[in-house]
Amino acid sequence: MADDGVRLVKPGTKYEGAQGVMYDAGVSRDTAGAEKVCMNVLPMPPGAKAKPHYHKGIETIAYMRKGECTVFHGERLESQTVVKQGEQIFIPDDVPHAPCNLSEEECVWIVVHSSGDDQEDLIRTEDLDYILE
């Protein structure tokens, strides 16, 4: 039988992103050969904060599976959007952002990027770190 490229990705593999948060690896270039899209699970314990960053030329869609989280976004992270369970957020390419779980409960994101690798072309904006301290 010919290989049609369909792949099943099972849970269990974790990795730390350049954003400083731990992901549960999902479909990506590495796990399934996906070139144009990837999806990962991002559990964030209370108080967890991603480091400010943007994805050069890559769009992001994130679905809040459990809990709620504040996403700081904009050139100087001047805007805040609280995303609650069942809601989704779209972050255009090249927009600096940083999700921060300011609640007292764990939140769990399902994150999709328009690239086969969510860390590819991820640009850390270290000059914005002080804003989240």
Which ranges hold each PLM region?
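A short, N-terminal "cap"/entry segment at the start of jelly-roll beta-barrel domains
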Residues: 1-36, 51, 124-133
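Conserved hydrophobic/aromatic beta-strand scaffold that supports enzyme active sites
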Residues: 39-43, 61, 80, 88-90
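Conserved short histidine dyad/triad with adjacent acidic residue
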Residues: 40-56
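Short beta-strand His + acidic residue motifs that chelate non-heme Fe in jelly-roll/DSBH
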Residues: 51-53, 71-72, 80, 91, ...
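Ligand-binding loop in jelly-roll beta-barrel domains
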Residues: 84-85, 93-119
